[in-house]
Amino acid sequence: MATITKRGDAFRIKVSLGYDENKKQIVKSTTFVPSKGTTPKKAQKLAEEYAFEFERHCKGYTQLNENMRFSELADWYFENYAPVELKEGTVYNYKSAYNNHIKPVLGNVRVKDINTPRLTQFVQSLKLQPETVRKIYVVLQSIFHRGVEQGFIRDTPCRNVILPKNRSKKKKPVLDEEQTSRFMKLIEEKKCDPDIKRIIKVLLYTGMRCGECLALSWNDINFEEMTISIEHNLADVGGKHWLTTPKTESSIRTIGMSQALADIFREQKKYQEQLIEAIGDDFSHPEMVFTSANGNYRDRSSLGTSLKRFLRGTEFDFLTLHSLRHCNATLLLNSGVDLKVVSDHLGHCDIGVTANIYADVLKSTKAKVADLVSLKLA
């Protein structure tokens, strides 16, 4: 949208038209001067109207198209915007939310007839968990926002929509040091595919997201420097697998590798070489650290099922693949590792994310520090 800056009695209007081939922002600007005697409030409104028309002129729009049905706007969004700007997995999830929940109710409605109260009524009619409703609303929000950007509609009706409140989630327990020791003993003693055991250990030792772990290639493992480079994520949608970028830019990181981890990777390499020798050229991805038995990308869902089966009937049956990441972070924080270091280690975009997720752990750690100081001063 155009930006408006007041300078004396005039208004400076700028419109961004994206970036050129050298990644330099393309900006068009103009100045609007209201006639003398115009009240400040009226001048601001006139400037906004002028900016709207100027932006439409810059982007080549000739007329609004608010008579279009919402399904037409959504079709444009999924054909032109989503494939270029969103990750393939996100596009899949957005399309699923649209086709299953939004299109049956709003698809045939003209865009000009969709207002804030109507959207509030729509989201409140969804008999789903609040977090699911919010995900559906995000799709609506994105479609309308792009519609405004492209000049199809004047404004988005998504402002001030009343959303259901998220229910407080029951926090899943994580392992303390004593439980971790018992868990590691269970891994060693209970019968299970050794390949799966190695993945579980890597997740627990590194705190990686499961998709990051399954996206590791042998080029990412540096035995000389004892480091692991995390540069990809294994996306998994509808049975299709592909490598993509990690969750955020800060998720691209390099972490240290302990000797225990190095030994696990060497075991995995030896195991994989045996598979390749048996299968030969039919082994699809010899460059990957963790694969299926025939060398295909490892399926996260089946891995989660294997973990669930492995832990069934034990004291650890509450653990999931992702909770191993939380266990890693909790162990680090309880060991006194600096919050910023833990945040970087986990690949969080912001230290505040780490502080928010592990607020209870940090509270406990602060209490331990206070007790330690008291003991020293006693």
Which functions belong to the PLM regions below?
Residues 130, 185-196, 206, 255, ...:
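Short, basic (Lys/Arg/His-rich) helix/loop patches that form interaction surfaces
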Residues 174, 234, 346-371:
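Catalytic-site neighborhood detector that most strongly recognizes the C-terminal catalytic loop/helix
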Residues 28-39, 169, 225-229, 245-267, ...:
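C-terminal catalytic core of Y-nucleophile DNA break-rejoin enzymes
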Residues 130, 134-136, 149, 153-216, ...:
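Basic, Lys/Arg- and aromatic-enriched nucleic-acid-binding interface segment
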Residues 7, 12-14, 160, 179, ...:
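Conserved tyrosine-mediated DNA breakage-rejoining catalytic core shared by Y-recombinases
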Residues 3, 17, 36-43, 66, ...:
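N-terminal core-binding DNA-recognition domain of tyrosine site-specific recombinases/integrases
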Residues 7-10, 17-112, 117, 268-285, ...:
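N-terminal DNA-binding module of tyrosine recombinases/phage integrases
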Residues 215-221, 343-349, 359:
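A short, basic/aromatic helix-end/turn motif that makes direct DNA contacts
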